[in-house]
Amino acid sequence: METLLGGLLAFGMAFAVVDACPKYCVCQNLSESLGTLCPSKGLLFVPPDIDRRTVELRLGGNFIIHISRQDFANMTGLVDLTLSRNTISHIQPFSFLDLESLRSLHLDSNRLPSLGEDTLRGLVNLQHLIVNNNQLGGIADEAFEDFLLTLEDLDLSYNNLHGLPWDSVRRMVNLHQLSLDHNLLDHIAEGTFADLQKLARLDLTSNRLQKLPPDPIFARSQASALTATPFAPPLSFSFGGNPLHCNCELLWLRRLERDDDLETCGSPGGLKGRYFWHVREEEFVCEPPLITQHTHKLLVLEGQAATLKCKAIGDPSPLIHWVAPDDRLVGNSSRTAVYDNGTLDIFITTSQDSGAFTCIAANAAGEATAMVEVSIVQLPHLSNSTSRTAPPKSRLSDITGSSKTSRGGGGSGGGEPPKSPPERAVLVSEVTTTSALVKWSVSKSAPRVKMYQLQYNCSDDEVLIYRMIPASNKAFVVNNLVSGTGYDLCVLAMWDDTATTLTATNIVGCAQFFTKADYPQCQSMHSQILGGTMILVIGGIIVATLLVFIVILMVRYKVCNHEAPSKMAAAVSNVYSQTNGAQPPPPSSAPAGAPPQGPPKVVVRNELLDFTASLARASDSSSSSSLGSGEAAGLGRAPWRIPPSAPRPKPSLDRLMGAFASLDLKSQRKEELLDSRTPAGRGAGTSARGHHSDREPLLGPPAARARSLLPLPLEGKAKRSHSFDMGDFAAAAAGGVVPGGYSPPRKVSNIWTKRSLSVNGMLLPFEESDLVGARGTFGSSEWVMESTV
């Protein structure tokens, strides 16, 4: 019973597995094979639930991008795999490792950029590989390694291939069809198709091939069907669309009998564009090589690099080879390199390289040769036990006066006692951090020196540095040294040895020295600190200067503010009444019954005292004439008298303009009073006019003279007048004067300027006689002169 149940369970599981099919796919179970068909189903990846026993799997026409190792794992029975017309751009290495039974792989019409060494690994039985219409730019040399002997059909057309692994193609002995059309191939290695005896179709259409290598396989392209055998089928060969270079190298191809005539010549210029099969055989010619440029002689120091150049032209382009002086062909090695342009580089020269190198340029039409003479300047070598050179066959033993020294015990026949140490022939002086001056001397009996060699090395390493110095120099400055380091330096002389016809060398002397230590970081820091300090000092000086300047301006401003009010408010006490014409009488001389005269209260601005000498004299004459007329008329008018004051500094422009404005205002007021005189006073006015002419200054009216001195018209400036008490003035004008010509002082309660009186409607038209009488009645202290500033 248990056996029956187990059998039923196994049958059910097998039936379920067989019936399992990926979504959107069609699974066909034909006899022993299982086919899974998923073409054009819009798949983005390989379905993971594909039956692993599938024999045929079609996934073409989808949108699969990536192939991973899990997609086809354990599908050992898969024979046909189609991945055409997808967007595959990457195949993970070893993705087909389990497909050991696969016969056909279609990867056409995808986006593969290249095929790596492990991309197709595991396809040991592959026969058909279709990879056309991709973006292949390169194929690894080992990409086809697993199926070289089984592959029958290889399609790599419509890609971007510049080359192929031709060695792998040569070993595909079972290859029947090879499609390489529509690529960028420009070269096919010679002998590539020699072993492809089963090749029936070769397509090289639309590439960049200029020539084809001669191969017997192409002779089968003209064989008839009668001569063909199963092991040597007729070859279908297509190579149209290539820019063939029609010269003697393609003459073998021209001699083949072919029916098609689609191939054309791309060069040379005389045959360009002509049909290949229509060109006569005698027109396929070549030009022998011609060497146009090469190195003639080269002198190289032993151990240094040497470059030999050789250029040649010809049709076809010649290949250049080099032959060493010992008749061996020079190739690429660790010491030499030969380039395609004909240049030979010797990285490290030796004494064996001395001689004539031969440049050989050869092509199908012939060859040309050129000689290059190379001379190697040999260098002395230092022994391991001492830093001095040991030339065993040197004959320059007397190059210095003390060079005949013993090499030390152990010498055969050396019974002579050791001599004293030689004098120093090499001196090192003027040692700095990076340079030193080396001087040496040679005895007069020494042979003629060809040149000197200076060699030195740092005590920390064993690398020697050489300097070649002309024989005329006995001193040399060694530069580019390391600071704070010890150096071992030797000077050697080189001359021509007539016995051996070689260059002989001998040591002149050696010396040791140490370069001075340098501290670039400390010096750099010191210079930075010094620069910053200078900037700070200069900035501090500028700031201090600005502060001092500001303080001086502030002090000057404060002093000016304190002095200005005191100057403008200075009172003039020596101003007396305009009616007495003299000094004020003392209290004892005052008339009886008169009240005591108080101190003068009149304050006069500085501008009224700063008159010129001419104006003062004119004012004095006017005052004297006015005084005479006033006494005759009984009005008791006193002249304006300004006592001389102490010499003052030169008045400013504002003060001078104020004085001129006051004089102008005074004259205008007098004219107005004369015009407004009443008929009752015409007689007095006539008398006054007569005296007015006497008081008038000789230079003209004061108003005209003041206007002529002012830079601007007076109408544009503010006009000021004498301030007086309105009520007292009116009372004085109406009541007359006190007998004796003296009026007691009155309090000036309301002081109005002319402008204020004019604005307020209180300016009264007084006559000049009344105004003069009022001035005589009032004391001088009742008049206040305002500044015009």
From Swiss-Prot:
Membrane topology term reads: Single-pass type I membrane protein
Alphabetically sorted, this entry's keywords are: Cell membrane, Disulfide bond, Glycoprotein, Immunoglobulin domain, Leucine-rich repeat, Membrane, Postsynaptic cell membrane, Repeat, Signal, Synapse, Transmembrane, Transmembrane helix
Residue ranges annotated for the Fibronectin type-III domain, each copy included: 421-518
Q: Cross-referenced Pfam families, in alphabetical order?
A: fn3, I-set, LRR_8
List residue spans for each LRR repeat.
53-74, 77-98, 101-122, 125-146, 150-171, 174-195, 198-219
Renumbered to this chain, region (Disordered) spans 383-424, 577-602, 619-654, 668-702
Disulfide bond entries: 310-359
Residue intervals of the LRRCT domain: 242-288
* Residue positions the entry lists as glycosylated: 29, 332, 341, 384
Give the comment on domains.
The PDZ-binding motif is required for cell surface expression, neurite outgrowth promotion. This motif is also involved in DLG1-, DLG3- and DLG4-binding.
The name this protein carries in UniProt is: Leucine-rich repeat and fibronectin type-III domain-containing protein 2
Native organism is Homo sapiens (Human)
Lineage per the UniProt record: Eukaryota, Metazoa, Chordata, Craniata, Vertebrata
